[in-house]
């Protein structure tokens, strides 16, 4: 009888330890992720994988006030292997392609998600960032940074649902129309975060091909 009771107690203890731990709902939560992989196979051409864009010198009087911009400078990201993909077995195929610009270090969330001037020292310009635009020169690109919240929403009644994001941050979108090569056009400008002080400006941003 004692052996049977001891065995039962051991089994009960094991079952209790094996169960999911009870965590306070006030100090815990869950994040559900949604996404999609498409059949498209665009690649960044070699000449666009590591580019430099040089903006012409500009007088500081062009950048007197916060949000002033100057010296629109075009640049292009070249893609290849973008011929139209035929869907098979109802697999998803995108009809548009663009670039997703992001930087965990340089995106300035306090200044419209422009790119911070990373040049340091006595010869660095002050209060000057770099802002990116789509090819029309009017649609500003918000570089995705740590503070970007457009991809997140709260679930109703604790049910995870896939909703349309506020902004997908796919810039310079071009239609995939059967041509192998696709060009994504953009514009860079100086951007004043306050009254500019003369000096050098330098920054960088990462990008990845994204589909819609």
Curated annotation (Swiss-Prot):
One of its GO terms (biological process) is cell adhesion involved in single-species biofilm formation. SUPFAM superfamilies: Bacterial adhesins. The keyword Disulfide bond applies. Residues 1-18 form the signal peptide. It is found in: Fimbrium. GO terms for cellular component: pilus. Disulfide bonds join 42-82. The keyword Lipid metabolism does not apply. PANTHER family: FIMBRIAL SUBUNIT ELFA, FIMBRIAL SUBUNIT ELFA-RELATED. Mediates adherence to oropharyngeal epithelial cells. Helps the airway colonization process. This is Major fimbrial subunit. It comes from Haemophilus influenzae. The gene is hifA.
